[in-house]
Amino acid sequence: MKRTKIVATIGPSSSSKEVLKDMVLAGMNVCRLNFSHGAYEDHLEVIKNIRSLNDELGLNVAILADLQGPKIRTGEMQKSGVHLEVNEIVTVQTDNVVGNEKVFSINYLRLPKDVNKGELILLDDGKLMLEVIKTDGKKQITCKVIQGGELSSNKGVNFPNTKISMPSLTEKDEQDLSFAIEQDVDWIGLSFVRSARDMIDLKHKISSAGAKAKVIAKIEKPEALECIDDIINESDGI
């Protein structure tokens, strides 16, 4: 039996029954629904199409609901974006401000409490990198630009060395999880897993709802590697 599975993420260009059928016949084993994008009606249409194809073709293509997880983003920047120069000092703050080369905001209020001197902040999928020089523990973080470039509004912010204290399931994730459970999906993917407790909590929510979906831990942060064996023990897939 083939143990390696092909997981395909479904988007607007691949959500029709005709295209999904071609993908299934080409070897797709798991249909991934990315809850970072798309409305529930879009995901529901894909679910209906996959289940219809399973009936028609006598197959069992699984459905994976991939939860977005906590998303930290930059706030509003000057209209054309700003250029951060290497070795320059920039302030990251939690109070809203129209960002420029010297200061910009983020949407996570506890960050000044979470970060420590020497830790890195990655902006826009790692295109830009900052190093924390100091934090006031309240509203502002002073950083040095390690890798510069253009920065615009609403870009993703990641913290490879920082233990973020925000919950693993956001309010949006809770709503998406309820929808996925209602649709009886086969798998639930949890983003930015940090500990086995994240997976235990997710499984508890699933079982409490009377569902039997299996869980996948997405390993995206170095701190997860510190307890990877425990995470594996509480997961059905990695």
List the model feature ranges, each with a label.
Residues 1-238:
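Non-catalytic helical/linker scaffolds that mediate oligomerization, partner binding
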